[in-house]
Amino acid sequence: MAPPSRRECPFPSRRFPGLFLAALALLLSSRSDACGPPPTFVAMELTSRPKPYYKVGEQVEYDCKKGYHHFAPFLTHTVCDRNHTWLPISDAPCVKKVCHYIPNPAHGQAILANGTYSFGNQLHFICNDGYYLIGKAILYCELKGSDAVWSGRPPICQKILCKPPPTIKNGKHTFSEVDVFEYLDAVTYSCDPAPGPDPFSLVGESTIYCRDSLGWSGDPPECKVVKCRFPVIENGRQTAGFGIKFYYNAAVMFECYEGFHIIGSDTIVCNSNSTWDPPVPKCVK
């Protein structure tokens, strides 16, 4: 049986070495006598699909990317020169699109995040003291189609006004006849005379002020009788805060007799629950 015959390439390099070398030389010369892919830019892009290499004298065109617009008279094309390099070009012709100018709101400020109105940037809004912001505190310059637009309407600064503060049982506050209070307006509470032998104590902050759009700086105080029991300490004595009756915030100090030491605090205060805080100490050997 005869061995199978081998098929040979009709144009092997061994039979036609001259033809093979000529083709290789033509291929190499076509690539060496050319430019590589054209440069890329942040703001521009080619108007046609890039090729691996370009002939000398071949020209490519650029157009501005989305979000950029052309700024004449700069060139937006380049040419493969005889040195097999692209003629210098930059993307300076294409500049970022910008959002329209927004002025400071009345009684406030509009602050650019990085000093320009170009797309991708932010505009921050703040209000002066005595005013609060209604609307979004930050707007973004965004692309909508081919235009640069703000992400919303600019906010406004509204004057801070407070409703009258709460009334309290067994007490009153100043300016009770006023219907509307402005920023930092303050009222002071006081207690009425008590009907019994012990007076009302004002528990809490006596003065609150109109703070912001949420209202007053704190809760109103209470007017109530606060009276702690007479403090008794065995094997010791009072050194300060003497009295017969002990009302809200009354303070008493103690010391132990010789040979005893104190357990607890040497100073106690009558708190709003009519108890001593901390508890009355003890004197032990």
From Swiss-Prot:
Q: Which residues are glycosylated?
A: N114, T167, T207
Query: Is Disulfide bond a UniProt keyword of this protein?
Result: yes
Q: Which PROSITE patterns match?
A: SUSHI (PS50923)
What are the disulphide bonds in this sequence?
Answer: C99-C141, C127-C157, C162-C210, C191-C223, C228-C270, C256-C283
User: What is a single cellular component term in the Gene Ontology annotation?
Assistant: cell surface
Which residues belong to the signal peptide in this entry?
A: 1-34
PTM info? N-glycosylated. Probably less N-glycosylated in testis.
Q: Where in the cell is it found?
A: Cytoplasmic vesicle, Secretory vesicle, Acrosome inner membrane
Main localisation: membrane
Domain named Sushi: residues: 35-96, 97-159, 160-225, 226-285
GO terms in the biological process aspect are: complement activation, classical pathway; innate immune response; single fertilization
What keywords tag this UniProt record?
Complement pathway, Cytoplasmic vesicle, Disulfide bond, Fertilization, Glycoprotein, Immunity, Innate immunity, Membrane, Repeat, Signal, Sushi
Q: How does it sit in the membrane?
A: Single-pass type I membrane protein
The record's listing under Pfam families reads: Sushi
SMART domains, per this entry? CCP
Free-text comment on this protein's domains from its UniProt entry: Sushi domains 3 and 4 are the most important for interaction with C3b and C4b.
The entry's function note states:
Acts as a cofactor for complement factor I, a serine protease which protects autologous cells against complement-mediated injury by cleaving C3b and C4b deposited on host tissue. May be involved in the fusion of the spermatozoa with the oocyte during fertilization. Also acts as a costimulatory factor for T-cells which induces the differentiation of CD4+ into T-regulatory 1 cells. T-regulatory 1 cells suppress immune responses by secreting interleukin-10, and therefore are thought to prevent autoimmunity.
Name under which the protein is recorded: Membrane cofactor protein
